[in-house]
Amino acid sequence: MDAIKKKMQAMKLEKDNAMDRADTLEQQNKEANIRAEKTEEEIRITHKKMQQVENELDQVQEQLSLANTKLEEKEKALQNAEGEVAALNRRIQLLEEDLERSEERLNTATTKLAEASQAADESERMRKVLENRSLSDEERMDALENQLKEARFLAEEADRKYDEVARKLAMVEADLERAEERAETGESKIVELEEELRVVGNNLKSLEVSEEKANQREEAYKEQIKTLANKLKAAEARAEFAERSVQKLQKEVDRLEDELVNEKEKYKSITDELDQTFSELSGY
């Protein structure tokens, strides 16, 4: 009987222990389920974050691609602008060469004008010599006086025309000086523009430059190129005007030289007639 009681007590104790272990295992199972649910939630959150990061990465890559495209466009615009500046430099160089040629023609015209003035002085001296000669033949004297009056009128007219030519030459020289000053101003503007191009090029190489500022610099740069082109056109127009003025002046000088030649021929004719008259008077 005692053995049965002991056995029952042992079985009861074992039952209690089994129940305790079952409770413990159940609690552990609950805790494991809670941890599993928590882990699954963390996994879902992690997947969500990964998806968000992937989306953000796609957006960043798209923005980077767009920024690279805009940068390439800016670099192309910069290359085009540099090409325009190089073309402007070449045109300004050609304009300077035209100005130099115009100055050479102006110097030639000035030299010819001086020679024509000397010829006019010589004609005036000859006129005075002829005027001071005394003639015994009254009719011949009257004819010579009329011819001298005509020659004096032609000489005065030539002097007036030479004065007009000199005035036109002075105007052309002033126009050329102004054109040279504007050309020098254009060169200074080009130097400033090249410096600004260098700064713009350095700024465009950095992706940190905002699109708004880059567009503002591009618009300012285009405006400066437009202003420089307008100034270049104005300088070219002035150079063309100076060239036409020099050509017109050259024609005027040539015409005056022809008139001087004709006047000299008239003086020679008068001198020949005077010599013939003196010979005839001496023969009497």
From Swiss-Prot:
Keywords: Allergen, Coiled coil, Repeat. The keyword Iron-sulfur does not apply. Residues 12-39 have a biased composition (Basic and acidic residues). InterPro entries: Tropomyosin. It holds the Pfam family Tropomyosin. Residues 1-284 form a coiled coil. Residues 1-39 are annotated as: Disordered. The keyword Phosphoprotein does not apply. Tropomyosin, in association with the troponin complex, plays a central role in the calcium dependent regulation of muscle contraction. Belongs to the tropomyosin family. The molecule is in a coiled coil structure that is formed by 2 polypeptide chains. The sequence exhibits a prominent seven-residues periodicity. Homodimer. This is Tropomyosin. The lineage of its organism: Eukaryota, Metazoa, Ecdysozoa, Arthropoda, Crustacea. The gene is TM1.
